[in-house]
């Protein structure tokens, strides 16, 4: 594919032209249930020939071998020479560093849960907020009665969300990978005036920066700097789930991610991950449909569309390819 075709960086002798895939009556009927989730692509009328060619394309370009390499920790971010480490947090037996980070976070979550507080005020933006928000609404009972989430730097937001609170009876969580995100730091300082650092916890990969800022050492919850922000819900960033629902539910969430990884690694072209990719490429590259609609009918999943939007657009909207070319 060329860069004009949505930046698909794969080589192939196959001729992916729309005229080759006009027989939509002879389409695949992919319906599969995995771990309680139903996947039904039958109504998309993806031609069998396109599906066959897409499988060949994946095999020619060793897509599954490349994913296995990323999963195993090979360098995927060539620009910064970094691995993609969010997989480690959800593995059954992660490397010691990631296991220690999860265990430390769970220890802190247990300590916080036993404190007497009225509200948790959570400061974060982008992936540091969208993931925890989705998990909170989906998995935590009465989430918004227990948590105030602040994600911008508009004083109107601070006033509306915190003016009625007794800040001395609040726990403050600052979620920022770099701990230098302007919106997050400015909003935290606007609300607290830096007066409640003993009841403030920083979830960050910048431990030195947190110490310099004044966060007590015991209140700094680290996670790996190679974990991308949009994938950070698998890291200690999701401490809210552990605080309010406990270790068992948090580990159950990680286990679900692990099962999805294993399904792709083991079932390959039969996995929902592969088939949803086939669906997207067919709609985007062949039919030239540039809009994806996500309807979340379940109230608890009302923030899924926002999370999925950032996840896909930030992942696929890069202007630099893997060879560092614009």
PLM feature segments, named:
Residues 120-134, 231-239, 305:
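Conserved phosphate/anionic-ligand binding catalytic regions in large, soluble enzymes, centered on
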Residues 131, 158, 174-192, 200-202, ...:
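Extended, hydrophobic alpha-helical segments in both membrane/secreted and soluble proteins
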Residues 2-114:
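Extended, charge-enriched "interface" segments that sit outside catalytic cores
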Residues 91-112, 135-171:
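Glycine-rich oxoanion-binding loops at beta->alpha junctions
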Residues 119-123, 171, 201, 293:
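Conserved beta-strand elements of the Class I
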């Amino acid at each position: 594919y060329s860069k004009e075709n949505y930046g698909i960086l794969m080589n192939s002798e196959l001729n992916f032209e729309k005229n080759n895939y006009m027989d939509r009556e002879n389409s695949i009927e992919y319906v599969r249930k995995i771990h309680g989730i139903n996947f039904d692509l039958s109504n998309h009328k993806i031609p069998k020939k396109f599906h066959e060619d897409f499988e060949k394309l994946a095999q020619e370009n060793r897509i599954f071998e490349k994913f296995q390499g990323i999963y195993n920790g090979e360098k995927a971010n060539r620009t910064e020479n970094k691995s993609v480490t969010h997989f480690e947090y959800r593995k059954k037996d992660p490397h010691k560093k990631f296991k220690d980070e999860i265990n430390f976070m769970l220890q802190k979550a247990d300590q916080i849960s036993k404190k007497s507080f009225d509200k948790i005020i959570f400061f974060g933006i982008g992936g540091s907020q969208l993931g925890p928000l989705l998990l909170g609404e989906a998995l935590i009972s009465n989430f918004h009665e227990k948590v105030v989430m602040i994600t911008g730097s508009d004083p109107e937001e601070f006033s509306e969300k915190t003016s009625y609170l007794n800040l001395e009876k609040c726990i403050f969580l600052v979620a920022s990978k770099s701990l230098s995100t302007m919106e997050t730091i400015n909003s935290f300082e606007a609300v607290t005036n830096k007066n409640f650092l003993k009841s403030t916890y920083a979830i960050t990969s910048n431990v030195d920066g947190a110490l310099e800022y004044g966060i007590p050492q015991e209140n700094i919850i680290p996670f790996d700097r190679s974990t991308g922000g949009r994938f950070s819900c698998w890291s200690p960033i999701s401490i809210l789930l552990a605080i309010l629902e406990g270790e068992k539910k948090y580990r159950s969430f990680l286990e679900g991610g692990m099962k999805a990884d294993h399904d792709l690694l083991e079932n390959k072209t039969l996995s929902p991950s592969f088939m949803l990719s086939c669906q997207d490429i067919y709609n985007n590259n062949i039919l030239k449909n540039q809009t994806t609609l996500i309807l979340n009918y379940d109230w608890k999943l009302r923030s899924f569309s926002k999370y999925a939007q950032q996840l896909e657009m930030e992942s696929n909207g890069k202007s630099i390819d893997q060879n560092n070319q614009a």
